Structures are given as structure tokens and as C-alpha cells.
Amino acid sequence: MSELTTIARPYAKAVFDFAVEQSEKDKSAVEKWTNMLEFLSELIRHDKVQSYLTSTSSTFKLADTVILICGEQLDQYGQNLVRLMAENKRLAVLPAVFNEFKSYVEEYKSLSQVEVVSAQQLNDVQQQKIITAMEKRLARKVILNCRIDSSLIAGAIIRTNDFVIDGSCRGQINRLANELRL
């Protein structure tokens, strides 16, 4: 586990718990927090903002500047989060907070991100078969993220948090090579 994740997790958990609590009154609260954190994460990743974070020593000035840039993207609670994280000199951790927050939301909504790396573009039927199989195996709704890696030669690699299924030709060749070395 990286240091950023260790620092980000308590912030993400607190924001998530607050968003769930808010969702009793406002059904879109979790979605609003997702949007706010995503916006903050993208803002903090920007090169000019990164250099500003390291050059500014006043936490109040830093927080006020970030809040000013965000404008209507942040509600009062989002602004409070920015102030708190600026005070603790943790604004640079916001992208990791967003990633951790997304993990909590996925767990809450019984979602799993599944990455499929294939040698060629998968058509809709192939993608649907993978989604169906993974939903059955994981017993939860699946969000498929596909990308192409021609070095696989053929087949695909399917990854989720818990496991990897390597059905690629490259993987089979590597396993065969390892067996032959014995």
C-alpha cells in the first residue's frame, strides 16, 4: 500500500460516510460528492496548480485560491474539505482521496471494475459475454474497462481487485516456456 493511499483513506472514508448520511435527505449526494472530488482531483493534477501548491506557504490563501477556482463546482461541504486538507497540507493527496472514494462507492453500490486487455478490439457480443460471466463469478454488477495490447498476440487478460485471468497467447507461451525450463 502506498503512502498516498494510507493518507487518503481516512479522508475518503469520512467523505463517503458523510455522503451516505446526506443521501438520506438528498438521493444524489453520493453522486454530487463524486463529481466534486473528481473535479478537485483533476484540478490538483494540473501542473500549474501543483507548482502553486509547493510554492504557497499560507494554507488559508491556498484553500481560498482552490475554492475560488472551483467556483460553483463545490458546495459548502466541499469547500470545508478543501480548507481542512489545506490546513493539514494534504491538498496534493486529493487524487488519491478520489480513487479511494470511488472504491467505497463501488462497494456500496455492489459494483466491480473489471479491466480487459485484449489483443484486438472486442465487439459488443464479446464484451457482453465477459460482463455476464464476471457478474456471475463476482455476484455483483460489473463495469468493463477495455483496452488493446497487440503484444498479447491473441486472447485477453481479465483483471479485477481479487484476481487475474490470463487467457492471452503471450501468457500461454510464457507458461509453456517456464514448464520447459524445469
From Swiss-Prot:
Pfam families: OSCP
Keyword Cell membrane in annotation: yes
Chief location bin: membrane
Covalent S-S links between cysteines: none
Transport keyword on record: yes
Keyword entries, A-Z: ATP synthesis, Cell inner membrane, Cell membrane, CF(1), Hydrogen ion transport, Ion transport, Membrane, Transport
A molecular function (GO) term: proton-transporting ATP synthase activity, rotational mechanism
Xref: PROSITE patterns: ATPASE_DELTA
Membrane topology: Peripheral membrane protein
Annotated compartments: Cell inner membrane
Any Gene Ontology CC annotation: plasma membrane
Subunit note: F-type ATPases have 2 components, F(1) - the catalytic core - and F(0) - the membrane proton channel. F(1) has five subunits: alpha(3), beta(3), gamma(1), delta(1), epsilon(1). F(0) has three main subunits: a(1), b(2) and c(10-14). The alpha and beta chains form an alternating ring which encloses part of the gamma chain. F(1) is attached to F(0) by a central stalk formed by the gamma and epsilon chains, while a peripheral stalk is formed by the delta and b chains.
Matches recorded under NCBIfam families: ATP_synt_delta, PRK05758.2-2, PRK05758.2-5
Function: F(1)F(0) ATP synthase produces ATP from ADP in the presence of a proton or sodium gradient. F-type ATPases consist of two structural domains, F(1) containing the extramembraneous catalytic core and F(0) containing the membrane proton channel, linked together by a central stalk and a peripheral stalk. During catalysis, ATP synthesis in the catalytic domain of F(1) is coupled via a rotary mechanism of the central stalk subunits to proton translocation. This protein is part of the stalk that links CF(0) to CF(1). It either transmits conformational changes from CF(0) to CF(1) or is implicated in proton conduction.
Family affiliation: Belongs to the ATPase delta chain family.
The protein, known as: ATP synthase subunit delta
The organism of origin for this protein: Histophilus somni (strain 2336) (Haemophilus somnus)
Gene it is expressed from: atpH
